[in-house]
Amino acid sequence: MKPRWPRLLRRVAIAFALISAAASAADAPATSGGHFDLSRPEISRFLDELGAQGMDRAAAAATLAQAEPLPRIIESMSKPAEKTMAWWEYRAHFLTNERIEAGVRLWREHRELLDQVALRWHVEPQYVLAIVGVETYFGRTMGHYRVLDALATLAFDYPPRAEFFRSELAQFLLLTGEEQIDPLTAMGSYAGAMGASQFMPSSYRHFAVNEDASTQRNLWSDWGDIFASTANYLQLHGWRYGEPVLAEAQYSESAELALAASLSLSDTLGAVRARGVHVDSRLPDDTPCLLLGAPLQSGMSYRVGFNNFYVITRYNSSRLYAMAINDLAQALLERIHAQAAP
């Protein structure tokens, strides 16, 4: 989705002038005891690039001057759960009885809204809820870092992904002007993700939905916007309503497993079956898929991922994440059906 730059940038420049005026009188929280030196060459170039794109450079600099470098964010980047936990540990963390019950309560509370979202965006409620459940425990843990601090720290003090986070920082500055968000108080994760569904700024700008036609897209507290935006993201990345995410697989002693090395759907169901792997699915043999293996406390779990599995990895490019979303979604669906039964 291409932004309408001339009109947006005029609006953002005005918004930034107002925000920076207010920010000059505000007291930023003292978390690290220092601020970024805007004369650093990479920061100066960043501000120059914003100015060249039409943004008010002085207003952007006034906002960035309030950002504080947070070294602990760099530490957090090196140990995400997807890289430090085995599958069985990761799954157990997200599929507690308490989390499932919290999801069922939220489903009951917003059943009509979730049904409307499913009808419009063609994404089943359990998957929308599962993403919010894994990301923030259904809105309970949306992050305790200022987004400005997190993005600036990663943009200028984390060389491995500096280019990506500088882009996200620019997107955040644009977003705060468009949505009238105070850049000094917006809170999020250590990576700068925001709201109950943890959208990065670029995703917020391009995929967030104003479900109730209010004045802004609010992913922190407006459940209509949260559910609709999550479903919109999945739908625009190719979600297919009614199709499975995963299927269980078993193999014979002579089977050739050939586990997938990437997230691409480089196999077909027929080819996997031809190698001696039994897949519990009624999908046709020409269905694109990938064969997955994940360690349990004892032994291995084998599954086949389909199109909707791949779509979930567009939200977070981790196999463990996509499997956890599937399993939590199924647990929510089973629990709400069981509790509805006479």
Map each language-model feature to its residues:
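Flexible, glycine-rich surface segments
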Residues: 183, 187-297
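C-terminal functional modules
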Residues: 293-342
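Acidic/His-rich structured neighborhood in mature extracellular/periplasmic domains
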Residues: 89-229, 235
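Bacterial N-terminal signal peptides
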Residues: 11-21
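An acidic, Gly/Ser/Thr/Pro-rich helix-cap/linker signature
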Residues: 27-118
